[in-house]
């Protein structure tokens, strides 16, 4: 048990009978009144979000989830299958991957963290940076060099991100998976 003051982003709490990951906390104090803690939460089972408030001294059940390093194996509609170092396979529903699904490709070498709740794989966390190939983008516009010019590009895995104007089809680029932003050409 933690008080609402002690909860930090990244903690997993039990709220309304489900596990929720804390994405953001905001504490406000007003004159004589006790502190109010506002939490932005994401439900790990339903992949939905909400915001809620607690009094600073309210007790909150924190839970510790199991996490395991795994590699992507294959897609069996509607499940993504991941394998650990001991060749155990874990199914994760496609809807639970969220934005990570755009970065998953056959034969990927990056290791992902699979999160478990009560023995069931419920989510996948990608590495913070990955390298993917650009499979489609428009050619650069000649003479358009005023400032930071970005254009849309489709990467292996099917995701679309904004890349710098100098990036061409076939280039390998580094992507920040937390924000979905282009970092550099590799």
UniProtKB/Swiss-Prot annotation:
It comes from the Bacteria. Transmembrane segments: none annotated. InterPro entries: Elong-fact-P_C, NA-bd_OB-fold, Rib_uL2_dom2, Transl_elong_fac_P/YeiP, Transl_elong_KOW-like, Transl_elong_P/YeiP_cen, Transl_elongation_fac_P, Translation_prot_SH3-like_sf. GO terms for biological process: peptide biosynthetic process. It is found in: Cytoplasm. GO terms for cellular component: cytoplasm. One of its GO terms (molecular function) is translation elongation factor activity. Pfam families: EFP (PF01132), EFP_N (PF08207), Elong-fact-P_C (PF09285). SMART domains: EFP, Elong-fact-P_C. Keywords: Cytoplasm, Elongation factor, Protein biosynthesis. Pathway: Protein biosynthesis; polypeptide chain elongation. Belongs to the elongation factor P family. NCBIfam families: efp, PRK00529.1. Involved in peptide bond synthesis. Stimulates efficient translation and peptide-bond synthesis on native or reconstituted 70S ribosomes in vitro. Probably functions indirectly by altering the affinity of the ribosome for aminoacyl-tRNA, thus increasing their reactivity as acceptors for peptidyl transferase. This is Elongation factor P.
């Amino acid at each position: 048990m933690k008080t609402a003051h002690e909860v930090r982003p990244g903690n997993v709490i039990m709220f309304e009978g489900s596990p929720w990951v804390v994405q953001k906390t905001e504490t406000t104090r007003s004159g004589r009144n006790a502190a109010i803690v506002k939490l932005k939460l994401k439900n790990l089972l339903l992949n939905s979000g909400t915001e809620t408030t607690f009094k600073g001294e309210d007790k909150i059940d924190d839970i510790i989830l199991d996490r395991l390093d795994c590699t992507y194996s294959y897609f069996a509609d509607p499940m993504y299958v991941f394998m650990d170092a001991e060749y155990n396979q874990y199914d994760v529903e496609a809807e639970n991957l969220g934005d990570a699904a755009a970065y998953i490709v056959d034969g990927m070498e990056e290791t992902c963290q699979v999160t478990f709740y009560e023995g069931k794989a419920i989510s996948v966390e990608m590495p913070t940076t990955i390298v993917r190939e650009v499979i489609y983008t428009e050619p650069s516009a000649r003479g358009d060099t005023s400032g930071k010019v970005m254009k849309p590009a489709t990467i292996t895995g099917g995701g679309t991100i904004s890349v710098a104007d100098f990036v061409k089809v076939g280039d390998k680029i580094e992507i920040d998976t937390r924000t979905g932003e282009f970092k550099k050409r590799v």
